[in-house]
Amino acid sequence: MSEWMKKGPLEWQDYIYKEVRVTASEKNEYKGWVLTTDPVSANIVLVNFLEDGSMSVTGIMGHAVQTVETMNEGDHRVREKLMHLFTSGDCKAYSPEDLEERKNSLKKWLEKNHIPITEQGDAPRTLCVAGVLTIDPPYGPENCSSSNEIILSRVQDLIEGHLTASQ
């Protein structure tokens, strides 16, 4: 078993957003910035920023990893670039105040439509509908989660109506 596989998910997480050199089986060597590690398989996803402004993404299977050596700790700029790598251009960032306003507005809308709604969690950010559906920030139809497809569809339609009415 390799040195990498002997480590656990919390130790693998320490490599995220750092530039590393990975030695894999058959003496293959990879360099790049660690975007993420898989806590189950120990796979590593490396990103390299190319000179033409594009990037390359490489996945290395956890069982093939022999050693991982940190080359560079990275700075805030690199971290931000990696964090927003796969977010779409239309992805909006919301301030805590905006999120609170959206949550309260949606909660009132759902209550007005006689939908039983509660807040759940330590920092009550997630809305819960009848104990079978959750709505996470930023409280859009795509942020709903439920195993009951009928309730999911109806609540998503209500949220869509709310967003249309409030614009």
UniProtKB/Swiss-Prot annotation:
**A Pfam family annotated for this UniProt entry:** Gemin6
List localization entries: Nucleus, Nucleoplasm; Nucleus, Gem; Cytoplasm
Q: Where is the AD domain?
A: 69-167
The UniProt record lists the Sm domain at 7-74
Q: Name one GO cellular component term.
A: cytosol
GO BP annotations of the record are: mRNA splicing, via spliceosome; spliceosomal complex assembly; spliceosomal snRNP assembly
Q: Which superkingdom heads the taxonomic lineage of this protein's source? A: Eukaryota
GO molecular function, a single term: RNA binding
Q: Which UniProt keywords apply?
A: Cytoplasm, mRNA processing, mRNA splicing, Nucleus, Phosphoprotein
Q: Does the keyword Translocase apply?
A: no
Point out residues bearing the modification Phosphoserine: S95, S166
- Signal peptide boundaries: none
Quaternary organization: Part of the core SMN complex that contains SMN1, GEMIN2/SIP1, DDX20/GEMIN3, GEMIN4, GEMIN5, GEMIN6, GEMIN7, GEMIN8 and STRAP/UNRIP. Part of the SMN-Sm complex that contains SMN1, GEMIN2/SIP1, DDX20/GEMIN3, GEMIN4, GEMIN5, GEMIN6, GEMIN7, GEMIN8, STRAP/UNRIP and the Sm proteins SNRPB, SNRPD1, SNRPD2, SNRPD3, SNRPE, SNRPF and SNRPG. Interacts with GEMIN7; the interaction is direct. Interacts with GEMIN8; the interaction is direct. Interacts with SNRPB, SNRPD2, SNRPD3 and SNRPE; the interaction is direct.
The function of this protein is:
The SMN complex catalyzes the assembly of small nuclear ribonucleoproteins (snRNPs), the building blocks of the spliceosome, and thereby plays an important role in the splicing of cellular pre-mRNAs. Most spliceosomal snRNPs contain a common set of Sm proteins SNRPB, SNRPD1, SNRPD2, SNRPD3, SNRPE, SNRPF and SNRPG that assemble in a heptameric protein ring on the Sm site of the small nuclear RNA to form the core snRNP (Sm core).
This one is known as: Gem-associated protein 6
Q: Which gene encodes it?
A: GEMIN6
